[in-house]
A protein has these predicted regions:
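Flexible "cap/lid" loop of the alpha/beta hydrolase fold
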Residues: 89, 94-135
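Catalytic histidine-centered segment of alpha/beta-hydrolase-like enzymes
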Residues: 231-247
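Conserved alpha/beta-hydrolase "acid-adjacent" motif
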Residues: 209-215
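Gly/Ala-rich beta-loop-alpha elbow adjacent to hydrolase catalytic centers
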Residues: 76-80, 84
Length: 259
């Protein structure tokens, strides 16, 4: 796996979302690199890790990263949040705290009942994206990044940035795109949240149409030492359109953590 390290200060690991790469965090890097040492990861099959031998699977990726990186605050955006959460739950000694940006322990809505997850994405939408990958994966990515930008006060700017950055480090591996969708569909880390061993920050975009802020609020309520914050007027990628606000939230959170 490719890891790019930038800046100096306390260590922060940044994990990108589906179909993207570490370069997507550029506006946040500009805000934070003077205060933190940032470790930007390209997950297997993405960006400069397109030919990585490691599979895109939560446990193996986390194990590889904790062996290579110092103890740090881990930040995960969208899909990347599943890896950050797993690190916090399974490799506590390596994680000072975990920040989830527009991410959820469970991405898909569950049926009604005691374990219902009311605010997840419709399973039918996931199936539609999976079918689209088989028929027209480029068009499917275009639809997905449009959904990511939708709702933001700066939707056109956000869409342009996502579109320009999508293939900036080459095309993602087509098979890994399907694997990533399966992770988003299948993984459910909710049962582990009440025993979360490190502090957590759940940072939502109020107008996010991919991860409902209400799902993030509910997840934060399940975990001890958790805080929920919301970026007004932001969609699914608030670090693109409101990088200063996201950076300030991370600074406050990091300052509250034990060394």
């Amino acid at each position: 796996m490719h890891i790019e390290t930038i800046g100096s200060g306390p260590d922060v690991v940044l994990l990108h979302g589906w179909a993207m790469h570490g370069g997507v965090f550029a506006p946040l890097v500009d805000e934070l690199s003077g205060d933190f040492r940032l470790h930007l990861v390209d997950l297997p099959g993405h960006g400069h890790s397109v030919d990585a031998a490691l599979p895109l699977a939560v446990a193996p990726v986390v194990e590889d990263l904790v062996e290579r990186l110092p103890r740090a605050l881990w930040l995960g955006w969208s899909l990347g949040g599943l890896f950050a959460l797993q690190a916090a739950l399974a490799r506590t000694q390596s994680v000072r705290g975990v920040a989830l940006v527009c991410s959820s322990p469970r991405f898909v809505r569950d049926a009604a009942g005691a374990g219902a997850w009311r605010y997840g994405m419709s399973p039918e939408i996931f199936e539609d994206f999976a079918a689209g990958l088989r028929d027209d994966w480029r068009g499917t990515l275009e639809r997905f990044i449009a959904l990511e930008a939708f709702g933001s006060d700066h939707a056109k700017e956000e869409l342009r940035t996502l579109r320009d950055g999508l293939f900036a480090r080459g095309e993602p591996a087509a098979g890994v795109l399907a694997t990533g969708l399966r992770l988003l569909h299948d993984v459910d880390l909710r049962p582990a949240l009440p025993a979360m061993p490190v502090p957590s920050l759940w940072l939502a975009g109020r107008r996010d149409r991919v991860v409902d802020p209400r799902a993030m609020r509910e997840a934060a309520a399940m975990a001890p030492r958790a805080r929920f914050e919301q970026v007004e007027h932001a969609g699914h990628a608030p670090f693109l359109t409101h990088a200063g606000i996201v950076a300030d939230a991370l600074r406050r959170f990091e300052a509250s953590l034990s060394p």
